[in-house]
Every structure is written in structure tokens, then in C-alpha cells.
Amino acid sequence: KPIPKEHGTHFKDGNVYLLTEKVANSSFYKFTESRQGIAIIRENPSTISNKKQSVSYLWLSPSNDEHAINPSDIEEVYGKLSSFASAHKNGVILLEGISHLISGTSFTTVMHTLSLLKDAISKTNIVMLIGYNPGSMEKSQRTKIESEFEIIKRGDET
């Protein structure tokens, strides 16, 4: 199935992309027009008005809600995403709230987990979009995460 072209960039199966959260969200919804998806997001899924049937939504929150994943439980985040990648031949993953994962664990732990996911995704036809807010990270963290993943920015972003 065709992969959407977003901001002049062609997404490729088996790759992980780093995008600002707003761009990641809009790109994810374009993908889910033709693919199944999983989204780990900061917004409570029950408040989303335009939910898609093809998407499983998980809430990155310490809430006891059945659809919540605690930001300190990086193993559960990894497990949900790697299980999705194994179970779906063509799919898309959206992971938002990197700063919440870092606060719940550590930057080193999050980077290690994202690197493992990148390796797993590279063997599939999955596309993974990581939404992040560059302003919420220390410069050294931002430099490290931006060196690990292909970055997609809008022309007006720095």
C-alpha cells in the first residue's frame, strides 16, 4: 500500500522517524487510512472524538484506567509495541510523550528501549513515528535522540 508523503519526505517501511508531536499525529492519521495502527499517546483515548476503528489507543498515564500504561513501565511500552509489530504485516506505530517516559524512568533507559524497537521495526513493514518536543529535552539528550532516528521537520521548525 502506498506510504503517505509528508512534508516532502517519503516514509519507508521498516523505519522509525522522529517528528514533532503535531506533525507525528497528523502523519499517523494519514497512515491509518490504509493501515492498522497502535498509538501510545498522552491524551485520554476516551476524549478523542475522531477515533479510527483501525487503531488501538493506549494512554501514557499513571491512571488505573484499563487503557493506560504508566510512564514508568517502559517494559510494558516495549511489549505492547513489539507485539503489535510482530502481529501486523503492515502497520503504523505512534509513540508520543517521550518526555513523560524519560521522567518516569531515565533518558538512558528510554534510548535503549527505542533502539531495541528500531532494530525490531527494521525487520518488518511497520513504520514507527516518535512524537517529541525538542524544547522539553536537554541539549545533550536532543542531540543523542536526533542522531539515532531520521528527523522530519516542517520548514518553519528549528
What are these regions (language model features)?
Residues N15-T20, K89-S106:
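Conserved P-loop NTPase "ATPase switch" module shared by AAA+ and STAND
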Residues Q141-T158:
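A short helix-turn-beta junction within AAA+ P-loop NTPase domains corresponding to the substrate/partner-engaging
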Residues I69-S72, G104-T108:
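Short, solvent-exposed loop/turn segments at secondary-structure boundaries
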